[in-house]
Regions:
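Short amphipathic alpha-helical surface patches that serve as generic macromolecular interface elements
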Residues: 59, 126, 185-188
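Active-site loop/helix belt of alpha/beta enzymes
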Residues: 2-117
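Generic structural hydrophobic/aromatic packing signal, biased to beta-strands
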Residues: 24, 78, 98-100, 129, ...
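Structural motif corresponding to alpha-helix initiation and N-cap regions
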Residues: 14, 18, 123, 174-175
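Active-site loop ensemble at the mouth of alpha/beta enzyme cores that anchors a bound cofactor
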Residues: 84-166
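C-terminal accessory subdomain/extension
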Residues: 134-241
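Short Gly/Pro-enriched turn/cap motifs at secondary-structure boundaries
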Residues: 58, 118-120, 179-182
């Protein structure tokens, strides 16, 4: 624990670190590999500069641990993982391994944190349009909480559950921020569309939703399809078999 305060041994508690490492290394059942760190508190930052500040503070918290490691277990590693900091920070002194879990896809949350451009988001959910209501600039999609989760982002006083894009031949076109998923029920979502886009969708069309939190989408939806139509299988849990 280098600052997140979710769980784990505090990085500065070298007494407990030493006891655990010695116990693990002397067991016939285990091998001491090193230290696993997730700085999830960077997700609470309000700006890119604050993300870097939190990251640098975590590195400082790890400095004594690194010195201890070099003296007692020099072959062990320090493994660090959090996508916001690993996307924009430059200093990774004394870190042996980086594991940014959301680096491959990104999402709209990462964009608003300052980790990436919206064009870097590499995942979208294709949702069928089930109803259109141009009189109130809204469409209803088959894409609700069970498909998109209920994670949300608030920007400029507006809370949304996904950004909107139009499907093209091999990718998608992201619409302006005033077009967004404004409300979710279990199976359906309500999407606000500006006047210039509301009449471009009919029931049965597909609309692309850039998720707020892409880590949750594959477990909710199953297989993925790339922009060339290839199916990408994901790891599944099998119970009672």
């Amino acid at each position: 624990d280098a600052g997140y305060r979710r769980t784990g041994v505090k990085a500065e508690d070298l007494k407990t670190v030493s006891e655990l490492a010695e116990t693990i290394s002397h067991s016939s059942k285990t091998h001491f590999k090193g230290f696993l760190i997730h700085n999830g508190h960077t997700y609470n930052a309000a700006s890119a500069s604050e993300i870097v500040k939190l990251h640098d503070k975590s590195l400082k918290n790890l400095s004594e641990l690194y010195e201890w490691k070099q003296q007692h277990f020099p072959e062990s590693i320090i493994s660090l993982g959090d996508t916001p900091a690993l996307s924009i920070a430059d200093n990774f002194e004394n870190i042996d391994e980086l594991r940014p879990g959301n680096f491959i896809f990104y999402d709209t949350m990462q964009h608003y944190l300052g980790s990436c451009a919206l064009e870097d988001v590499a995942m979208a959910v294709a949702c069928p349009v089930v109803a259109t209501h141009p009189e109130r600039n809204e469409i209803v999609i088959y894409g609700g909480a069970v498909h998109l989760s209920k994670d949300s982002v608030t920007s400029n006083g507006k809370t949304f559950y996904g950004r909107v894009a139009m499907i093209r031949q091999s990718d998608w076109r992201i619409l302006p921020a005033s077009n967004y998923v404004k409300k979710l029920s279990q199976e359906h979502g309500v999407v606000h569309l500006d006047d210039g886009f509301i009449h471009q969708f009919e029931p049965g069309d597909l609309i692309m939703i850039l998720p707020v939190h892409s880590c949750l989408i594959p477990p909710l939806l199953g297989n993925m399809i790339d922009t060339e139509g290839n199916t990408i299988s994901i790891m599944k849990n099998y119970r009672n078999e």
